[in-house]
């Protein structure tokens, strides 16, 4: 395969990997709120949405950090 073809394939794979699956768009968000920001290195992306996290965990965003965290509930 030519280098141009490989570059196109790589670009398409990258775009495909970044797109959110349509099936997650119609799902409601999980209950609860994200806890305070953890102390971690910058720009870690562990998840893209709640449904990529196990159990009741939520996909929480702290700046450029995305990670699965146990929710907190405020009364």
From Swiss-Prot:
GO molecular function: serine-type endopeptidase inhibitor activity
One annotated Gene Ontology cellular component of this protein: extracellular region
Superkingdom assignment: Eukaryota
Subcellular location: Secreted
Keywords, in A-Z order: Antibiotic, Antimicrobial, Disulfide bond, Secreted, Signal
UniProt entry tagged with the keyword Signal: yes
Annotated ranges, domain WAP: 27-72
Pfam family for this entry, one: WAP
Signal listed as a keyword: yes
Gene3D superfamilies tied to this protein: Elafin-like
Signal peptide boundaries: 1-24
Main location: secreted
Free-text tissue specificity from the UniProt record: Expressed by the venom gland.
GO biological process: antibacterial humoral response; innate immune response; venom-mediated disruption of cell wall in another organism
Cysteine-cysteine disulfides: 34-60, 43-64, 47-59, 53-68
Role summary: Damages membranes of susceptible bacteria. Has no hemolytic activity. Not toxic to mice. Does not inhibit the proteinases elastase and cathepsin G.
Assigned protein family: Belongs to the venom waprin family.
Protein name: Notewaprin-a
Organism the protein comes from: Notechis scutatus scutatus
